[in-house]
Amino acid sequence: MSASTAAPARDRLRIAIQKNGRLAEPARSLLAACGLSWRQSRDKLFCYGESLPVDLLLVRDDDIPGLIADGVCDLGIVGQNELDEQASARRRAGLPAAYHAVRGVGFGQCRLMLAVPEEWEWQGVAQLAGKRIATSYPAILADWLERQGIDASVVELSGSVEIAPRLGTADLICDLVSSGATLAANQLKPVELVMESEAVLAGAVREPADARAALLAMLLRRMDGVLKLRDSKLLMFRAEQGNVDALRRLLPDADPLVQLPDDGNGALRLQTMCHGAVTWQRLEELERAGAQGLMVLTVERSLA
């Protein structure tokens, strides 16, 4: 075991992620791609970092902002919706900002939307006046209603929001929507977007100034490298000099072409990093424009 891994407990970086749920596996995979590995405790709530002094806490997603605010952990991967909800609640309670979104992590996309019974004829937000809206995000919804100038009642529920209209406890709902299947199953239809959300890496407003600062900087650099390359491919091919400009125009989402040492066949050897989809149709189009020996390679990590 290295000296850095055996560092004192709070010289170690702590990251909270969802124990179960739709963000759990993508979050763990992202951190593993950054070179982190762990030894899990018996209670399966704490994972001790083995490759680096970076530990994991496996918790409920709505606990993550509070753990960051209290200094229990330094970072967390959580939905922007959950982060904004608790930040708004803190602001309404007169508490200072304690955390912020450091960067998006490219998964967990969803929308917080108003949904009404299917029989409603939706005519716009003015229709909400005097209505009861059930939600698990009361602070976000209250802020949104204020911006819209609408006086409506917010009914806070911790779960099963979609059945509130059928139970008579609300007229409509404000809830997260991914595919819309749950709404349709409960005879509801989405009508108004309240916010777009995705998973984010959240951190404390006041960053650590001790040994954790270097760990944080290293982790963020690695994560940027992973995220940049997540949908990228290395494209390699040969081409005659006269075809290079035409090929470059077919690669608007790619880095500048890099010329490799000549292989003795007369053609240029070129490579570039493509940041969009590299489909069969795209390869065939490049071939027609003069590219030869096309190869598409997956790139796992990069330091830029």
Curated annotation (Swiss-Prot):
Q: What class of enzyme is it?
A: transferase
State where the protein is found: Cytoplasm
Q: List each coiled-coil range.
A: none
Entry EC number(s): 2.4.2.17
Which pathway does the UniProt entry assign to this protein?
Amino-acid biosynthesis; L-histidine biosynthesis; L-histidine from 5-phospho-alpha-D-ribose 1-diphosphate: step 1/9
Gene Ontology CC annotation, any one: cytoplasm
User: rRNA-binding: present as a keyword of the record?
Assistant: no
Reaction(s) the record says it catalyses: 1-(5-phospho-beta-D-ribosyl)-ATP + diphosphate = 5-phospho-alpha-D-ribose 1-diphosphate + ATP
Q: How is its activity regulated?
A: Feedback inhibited by histidine.
**What does this protein need as cofactor?**
Mg(2+)
What's the main place this protein lives?
cytoplasm
Q: What are the TM regions of this chain, as residue ranges?
A: none
Matching entries from PROSITE patterns are given as: ATP_P_PHORIBOSYLTR
According to its UniProt entry, the protein's GO biological process terms are: L-histidine biosynthetic process
Q: Which family does it belong to?
A: Belongs to the ATP phosphoribosyltransferase family. Long subfamily.
Q: What does this protein do?
A: Catalyzes the condensation of ATP and 5-phosphoribose 1-diphosphate to form N'-(5'-phosphoribosyl)-ATP (PR-ATP). Has a crucial role in the pathway because the rate of histidine biosynthesis seems to be controlled primarily by regulation of HisG enzymatic activity.
NCBIfam families with a match to the protein in the record: hisG, HisG_C-term
Q: What is this protein called?
A: ATP phosphoribosyltransferase
Organism for this UniProt entry? Xanthomonas campestris pv. campestris (strain B100)
Lineage, uppermost ranks: Bacteria, Pseudomonadati, Pseudomonadota, Gammaproteobacteria, Lysobacterales
